[in-house]
Amino acid sequence: MEYLLFLLLFAGFLTFLPRFLIYAQITSSTTTTTPVPAANRRTIRVGVAAVQTTELDSIGWPMSGGAINMAIQKLRDDGFIAPFDFEVTVNYTECDRSLGAAVGMEFMRTKRLDVVIGPPCRDPMEIMATMATYYSTPMLGWGLVTDSKFTDTERYPYLTNIMANSLSLGFSLVKLLEMMEWDRVALVYEESAQDYPLSVINDVETAINEYDTFAVNVVVKQALPGGDLNDAQYISVLNRIKLRCRIIVSVFQTAPTRRRYLKMIDQQGMANEEYVHILLGLRSIGFGKQSAGLTKCELNCLSSGLAPFWDIAPDDGLNDRLKQAATRMLVMDLSTDVPDINYLNTFTMNCGAVVVNPPVSCATPACINASTSPPSAFARSLHDVFYLYGLAITNLYNQDPAYLNDIDKINGALQLNFAGLTGEVSINANNSRVPKLMLYALNDKYDQASFMNLTYSLNGGAVSVSLAYTNEASLWYWYGGKRPLSVPVCGFAGTDCPQSFVDQYGALVFAIGGVLIFAMLFVITCFFYVMRQKRLERDRIDAEWQIPLVKLQAPPKRDKERMSKRSLQSGPSNITDTSKMTFDNTFSNYSIFYLDKEPVLSTAHPASNLIRTDYDTFVRLRKLDHENVNKFVGMSIDGPEYLAVWKLCMRGSLQDIIGQGNFSIDPFFMFCVIRDMAEGLKYLHNSFLHVHANLRSGTVLVNESWQAKLTDFGLGTLAEEKKPMKRRQLWMAPEVIRGTLLPHQIEKSADIYSLAVIASEVLTRKEAWNMAERKDTVDEIVYRIKKGGPNAPRPELDMDGVEINHNLLILIRDCWSEEPADRPSADVICNLLKNMMPKKGNLMDHVFNILEDYTTNLEVEVEDRTKELTAEKKKADVLLGRMLPKQVAERLKQGQTVEPEGFDSVTVFFSDVVKFTQLAAKCSPFQVVNLLNDLYSNFDAIIEEHGCYKVESIGDGYLCVSGLPSKNGNAHIKQIVELSLDFMSYCKSFKIPHLPREKVELRIGVNSGPCVAGVVGLSMPRYCLFGDTVNTASRMESNGKASHIHLSAASYTLLMKHYPNQYNTASRGDVIIKGKGVMETFWVFERNNQFMGVSSNSGYQSDKKATNNGSSPESTPPSTPPMHEVKANSPVRHRKPPSPSSPTLSKRSVSPIMEAKARDIHNEETEALYRQFRRQETLALI
């Protein structure tokens, strides 16, 4: 016995262990939100009117209260309510009105709590919601409070209900009945102490009575008794329904009562294809139920994550049978789609356990024992309503903490949308939940599936339906794909089956039908044969002008030369005869395609609905044939836009020829072009078109024989524009511009006006109205033309010395007359032009003579341009040679890449103007620029004498190099030394014009060694040096002295090896160089007169023993400054050198060399900082 007891206790421990682990994880979870200081935190006092023993499985506090703790933890995990703490006060109303009033007085009057979560029962909620209105306290509703009365914002302005009201459920039901044409229903509901199912049924009945577009007859309204002892009464109610109705609407509060109903209808034979059972609910569970234990649904669970309500454990043998019966049931409920199924499972398994935790802290025995119980039916609603409140106060606090004391602000902040445990929660402006109902049914896999989405508008009362199926037969899968009828075909008793029509009139119908079918088949066959012949003929004709888009091939693109971005060489010049037309400069208003390897022109038009008349027009357009009318090839209408295809005229449009101005047009050519246009217009006016309606110089093409041809005509609606381009109105007649005529009402006289404007372009050889030289804008000219009158503007006929028949000018003026009736017809114009013909001859011969003259002039012009190009190229080469070394520039000009090149031995020269900052401070910016320009111009001349290369000059700094890019053996050291001495010599004689007392002194540094040089950059390429040799030369300059030439050991060694005794030099001694350590450096003072043959008066003297004569240090003149000495005005301050007799200095402790090194270290660091500051100040001054 003891062993059995131990096994039971161990099994209980194993059952509780997973629950404990998950709970521990929840209670220990932390958020990453920023902690709020204690002074800024606020405690929200929450009052909860709960029930402890009433309706325990539905709304009982021990099985529901944990939802508040779960909601608080969820809010904190999601980053909300960080500045808040919660104090929860719970009082029990037990769904009693009087207790509800007492609790309401305590919460709202005595304690003045911040928010009250109302009782989950209808009667006490009505009392407390009224009190909340009086005391202006926000109140939250959940549970069994679905009555439509709670949506009345005048009575309950401060009530926010998370539950959808049952009246919206009723209207949605009636909408479903209307769609399915079910006009007879039965209403059944579960008996309940709180009358929740009855209140839902009452609202449903109210919706049925108020629905005015579809009448529904409620044949039975009956409560279904509870308890197994009342089966006989239960069966009696179902039998009444069987005799009166097939559509049964039911409301149940709990899953067991739903299962019992399913069991009873199966026993009574009401679970077949004749019956439809519509189950109503507002709990977001559909066909599901709350888990019976603490484990989540593992087997036979629905897609919503819940177990089906017909499944019980252990199985009583009816689970499978009742599952089959459930296929005859539809469920209308709030959406069961919960985005976070994992959190739903966590909530289900932990809601009962956390009720004992703060701030809820329920310590009753029922709460303590609830840890092993599932949450109540409406616990998820309590969770969502508290989560909604937490979101609202967080938003208000973030806006202004004072808003938490404003009841209207709180009320407005509660109007939120979020995804909760009861589905998608949306609170509208009335602080009521927008009901988003779903119609669920079982699919072929016995799984819950949604087939409709019904949304009820609380303002207008309308129900919008969104179908989740494409074929209604999928909804009735278990009914054989057919919708059940409200009244069976054979009546409710099965005795009223009507006699079929076939039985009554079958023989007669078959006889008459056979004759009629034969006659109809004959007529239809004849009709389709005739229609097919007509269609084939029509298709054959239409195929002549219809051009498939795939047959229009774009012309091949011409190859373009690509130049290397590293090459500076000029590309070859391609000079061609400008009289040769190309596709790029000839057809600015057209597109070029190849059709069957022949080039054609096309104009694009927006796609529109073409009618048969348009097709006939295109057929007739193809038949138009005249030497002055361009050939219409066809239309392409199978692309995104329509393309009208015309024959190609290689010379282009008349507008482009005149605009380019690259051809000399003489009077004979002008006359021929005007005559061709008139002949073409005459042909069109006498054709079926009667008018061109789009005539301008851009629609006049010129072919190879210089023959003008009219194009872009007769396209009807394709050519019409609702708002033509302003510039095109320059060719339009005044009556057309005024907009008084529709496109099909344009007369021939309008074309005559356009012809006159084009003629003015031809005669003046300028664009229409000469807009390039006119001060008037297009809008101003169009306005004056539209205004009309005797002084209406017209194009100028300035012939510019060209002799034209005066009668032709008179004819043009007559053609653009203000009155359409005064304009001559095309026939008259052609006759007059014939009489005015200046001479007879071939236009092509005339044009060829003009082209020969033009070619001669072009050759002369090309030769002049070539000379100019050669001169400019020489200038560019000179400029490039100044920017880069000649060898590098030549390689770049030839298109060759300049790779970086290494040099084994070069000499680098750095110089800097001493005290340049002080000099710049005494000068204006322009004087500084002039000073540097004068100085560097002479420096550049000295550089050219010595064959060195100037790399760059920045401010007062100067960088030169010898030994690259052309190698010169070891001569580079001598060239740099000579250059340095000449620089020093020049600076002695250089005078500053505006500062005659000031002198320019240089500090020069020289170093020799290997180096790498190369071109850097594309837009402004520069020849740059890289390597430690350059850095060391810069250090030689920065560590040098004014008017001294400072050599590194490498340069000195090279100089002495290849040019010994040619220069007076001296060792400076060991100097600490930044980045290099201790280095021995040298001075160069002057040329040696014995070997160079040139006297030197430089006056330089050595601090150390001279290397050319071996003199001792005692022989150094006293005027030679010591190594550590600095100018008096130098910003560097030095301590006074200690006396040789000082007791702190001994021959062993401090040597003269070490003393000089110490002073040089101090000098180097301070002088380097000072030089950097001086350069920045100089650049700022410039």
Curated annotation (Swiss-Prot):
Residues 1094-1164 are annotated as: Disordered. PROSITE patterns: GUANYLATE_CYCLASE_1 (PS00452), GUANYLATE_CYCLASE_2 (PS50125), PROTEIN_KINASE_DOM (PS50011). One of its GO terms (biological process) is receptor guanylyl cyclase signaling pathway. The keyword Coiled coil does not apply. Pfam families: ANF_receptor, Guanylate_cyc, PK_Tyr_Ser-Thr. One of its GO terms (molecular function) is peptide receptor activity. Residues 1142-1152 have a biased composition (Low complexity). Residues 1-24 form the signal peptide. It is an enzyme of class 4 (lyase). Its EC number is 4.6.1.2. It comes from the Eukaryota. Residues 907-1037 form the Guanylate cyclase domain. It catalyses: GTP = 3',5'-cyclic GMP + diphosphate. It is found in: Cell membrane. Its main location: membrane. The chain crosses the membrane at residues 508-528. Keywords: Cell membrane, cGMP biosynthesis, Glycoprotein, GTP-binding, Lyase, Membrane, Nucleotide-binding, Receptor, Signal, Transmembrane, Transmembrane helix. Expressed in IL2 sensory neurons. InterPro entries: A/G_cyclase (IPR001054), A/G_cyclase_CS (IPR018297), ANF_lig-bd_rcpt (IPR001828), Cyclic_nucleotide_synthase (IPR050401), Kinase-like_dom_sf (IPR011009), Nucleotide_cyclase (IPR029787), Peripla_BP_I (IPR028082), Prot_kinase_dom (IPR000719). Residues 529-1182 are cytoplasmic. Glycans are attached at N91, N369, N430, N453. Belongs to the adenylyl cyclase class-4/guanylyl cyclase family. PANTHER family: GUANYLYL CYCLASE, RECEPTOR-TYPE GUANYLATE CYCLASE GCY-19. Guanylate cyclase involved in the production of the second messenger cGMP. The protein kinase domain is predicted to be catalytically inactive. This is Receptor-type guanylate cyclase gcy-19. It comes from Caenorhabditis elegans. The gene is gcy-19.
